[in-house]
A protein has these predicted regions:
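The feature captures the beta-strand-to-loop junction immediately N-terminal to the Walker
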Residues: 44-46
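ABC ATPase C-loop
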Residues: 158-159
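Conserved ABC ATPase signature
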Residues: 141-145, 149
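ABC-type ATPase nucleotide-binding domains, specifically the catalytic core motifs of the NBD
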Residues: 23, 64, 104-122, 130-135, ...
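Helix-to-loop junction immediately C-terminal to a conserved catalytic motif
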Residues: 59
Length: 232
């Protein structure tokens, strides 16, 4: 991570005093965080801590009751999720959620609804650069893939729109450590090659401090640096 990596020395994403939740009930309280271009930030916490809600607030799929979310120095609180996608934010949800009856290729295309048909092949090749096995299996039904390969499809689908910010929800869930290594290595390469920012939500037991630039902890709806929690 470097402040100069985006030329302007300005964070890609800023959250200031954000409150968000469901059906009028707040789950997040005065959340403050920033993400710089080209860095990986891991957001860790237990079940029900608010990790998923925070990613969805950034993506625009839950209600934001207060505070401000800024992306590329634009206030996006009122933007619909599809507008955020067009602006460069992409989401890989928990549980991978691939379309089991569709091929790998078709699953990837599902992440490229705003991409001209003439560009789909090139976009797929971009994905295969980081996940070569998907290129060899692009005509295979996603439901027949291993859990690790399905996770690669989910992240690849998020890459198809060529985002500047990728939100990844619990990519380690249910995967062997060696597979998790490959997934994180691919995310690191994507950050370096494309100056993409990545925010990963993980459980505490899946925390990989050495594979990211910063760790933030979410507890009872608020976010604190991992280092400050470790000192308490």
């Amino acid at each position: 991570m470097s402040e100069s990596s985006n030329g302007s020395g300005y964070p890609k994403l800023i959250l200031e005093n954000v409150r968000a939740g469901y059906d009028g009930v707040a789950v997040l309280f005065d959340v403050n965080m920033e993400v710089w271009p080209g860095e990986i930030v891991v957001l860790c916490g237990g079940n029900g801590a608010g990790k998923s809600t925070l990613l969805k607030a950034i993506m625009g799929t839950v209600s934001v009751f207060g505070g401000e979310i800024r992306y590329d120095d634009q206030r996006i609180n009122r933007w619909a999720s599809h507008r955020r996608t067009k602006a460069g934010i992409s989401f890989s949800p928990e549980g991978r959620r691939v379309f089991a009856s569709l091929t790998v290729k078709e699953n990837l295309h599902a992440g490229a609804s705003h991409v001209p048909t003439s560009q789909l092949s090139e976009r797929r090749q971009d994905v295969y650069e980081y996940f070569p096995i998907l290129g060899r299996r692009e005509e295979q039904l996603a439901g027949t893939l291993s859990g690790g390969e399905q996770q690669m499809v989910a992240i690849g689908r998020a890459l198809m729109s060529r985002p500047d910010l990728i939100l990844v929800e619990e990519p380690s869930q249910g995967l062997a450590p060696v597979v998790v290594d490959r997934v994180y290595q691919a995310l690191q390469r994507i950050c370096v090659d494309r100056n993409v920012s990545v925010v990963i939500a993980e459980q505490f037991q899946q925390l990989r401090v050495n594979d990211c630039d910063r760790v933030l902890v979410i507890d009872k709806g608020t976010v604190v640096p991992y280092e400050s929690l470790a000192k308490t």
